[in-house]
Amino acid sequence: MYEFELINKYFSHLTKRSKSSLSLNEDVFFNKSNKLVVSVDTYVDGNHFINFKKPDLVIKKIIRSSISDLLCKSVKPKYYFLSGSGNSKVFNKNNLIKISKSLKEEQKKYNIILGGGDTVWSNKLSFTVTTIGFSNKIIYRNRSKLVRIYM
């Protein structure tokens, strides 16, 4: 079953009272009255990155991928929340220093701020990033007009 098929079949009915959820078809939550835009992404070792030998590069990839959900909606990201699950082998002192340094670089590059997060002990390495931005409007996927592009 494909992602949107799964969402439509099992979860979209849970959002019927909330226009802000956009029927779960836009990869973001958009509350017009508060100008609030939120997106959540999860990254799992073996699915979204091959290994964690270069944690600094993995962290940059997941931050950039996560903020791109807002950027493609024409929303400037402001805050992000980072949760990580892993064990002491991957979250050792050396890796944590590299992760912290990469996060600082990404924050400076994209003018974003870490708002919080969580850590969980697990044998399976994964990260979840929630991004938050503010905007009067967004670009909707399902309202985009198909245009031919020639290269």
Which stretches of residues belong to each language-model region?
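Glycine-rich anion-binding loops of enzyme active sites
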Residues: 43, 76-151
